[in-house]
């Protein structure tokens, strides 16, 4: 089930379980995971696979970690308009929703990839390593933003 509002997401999610965060890209998909208390988002892995294989890999992760919900970053232009990548992410989210019986929250992800890259640069991480892990770091930034929105929501408590 695809969800666009944090209050609906909180009603649908099993908040006693960890949440998965996803930064979808054509070549790489970054994956992050929350702790059980939903206070921290941690980079988990980067998936390099085709569309259906990506869905299968995420399903494997969801089962292995007993995930209660998923957050997927939804890219927009700075002015809030959709891009071709926005539509690809929505298509991917629909495929994932058809495969998994978990609530999926589509969360605005403007500038998260840039923030992830800048964060890794500040840490003096070499470019080759940055390129290998930037998607999972972006996924953790996306998930962290959703976790903060959850904590700020009155329906969370």
Swiss-Prot record:
Predominant subcellular localization, coarse grouping: cytoplasm
Pfam families: RuvX (PF03652)
Keyword entries, A-Z: Cytoplasm, Hydrolase, Nuclease, Ribosome biogenesis
Keyword Nucleotide-binding: no
Location of the protein in the cell: Cytoplasm
EC numbers for this chain: 3.1.-.-
Record GO terms (molecular function): nuclease activity
EC class name: hydrolase
Domain of life, source organism: Bacteria
Single biological process term from Gene Ontology: rRNA 5'-end processing
One cellular component (GO) term of this entry: cytosol
Similarity field: Belongs to the YqgF nuclease family.
Function statement: Could be a nuclease involved in processing of the 5'-end of pre-16S rRNA.
Protein name: Putative pre-16S rRNA nuclease
Species this protein is from: Orientia tsutsugamushi (strain Boryong) (Rickettsia tsutsugamushi)
